[in-house]
Amino acid sequence: MKIVDIHCHLGPCKVFDLDTSEEALMGAIQKNKIDAALVLPFPGAPDVKKIHNDIAKLMKKYPKKIFGVVSLNPHQDEKEYNAEVDRLIKDEGFVGIKLHTIGHAISPLATDAKKVFEAAKRHKVPLMIHTGAGIPFALPSLVIPMAKAYPDLPIILYHSGMAHIYSTEAYIAAKLCKNIYLEGSWISINEKIWFVGDLGSERIVLGTDLPENTAVEIFQYRSANLSDKDLANVLGENAIKLFKLKI
């Protein structure tokens, strides 16, 4: 059974006062027998280009195990934004793009957010969006109009509204939009069981966010009495299909 963690970070963050070293990241991956991990900078990275380049180096160091995700502040010139996205996806092989609502102070409905959706559509890669902490920008419901406007774009709600804050709203968003998938880091095991049971295991993906949380997220799904098929879907198969991973 493959395990794919679609939400890992590398480097420092000035917004949330966090710092995940390569040693901490790879230690959690190896200790928890993760087959592949999607890695991105924190929103408060003091030098985001350096961190993206560090992730690209990790991809070469750990081929078929580490995959990069683009995470750029959308509040910049559109040509500059697109040029960096193009470089990372075309030249470095990154497999997704993130819109960090709270970290970059942006609503999914904002004018500057459209370039993020358009970039994901153009490159045919999934778009991940931070939800939960950071209201009003991080409301899961704000993604609904954009998911309907981009029906062929897979959109993953990181945190699924987060720890009872807006998890029900994330569920409603996924219920209304078949192209919305839920990543459940920091929500409870009861919510995870509910999502799998009601939405179907094909709509849920594993993400852990921080090395300290890796074992917890995996254990919750393994202790949820899911069928072998449902567990395999959530832990890895869905991510492999969504991101077209060759592992």
Located regions from the model:
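Active-site-proximal loop/turn and secondary-structure-junction residues that shape catalytic pockets
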Residues: 43-44, 72-74, 101-103, 133-135, ...
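Mid-to-C-terminal alpha-helical segments outside catalytic/metal-binding sites
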Residues: 1-6, 18-36, 122, 201-203, ...
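A general structural detector for well-ordered alpha-helical segments in enzyme core domains, enriched
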Residues: 21-28, 51-58, 81-88, 112-116, ...
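Conserved residues at the C-terminal ends of beta-strands
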Residues: 40, 100, 207
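Histidine-centered catalytic micro-motifs
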Residues: 3-12, 102, 128-132, 160
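Active-site gating/metal-coordination segments in enzymes
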Residues: 35-36, 46-128, 134
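Conserved, mostly hydrophobic/aromatic
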Residues: 7, 29, 55, 88, ...
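Catalytic pocket-lining loop regions of alpha/beta-barrel enzymes
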Residues: 92-95, 106-205
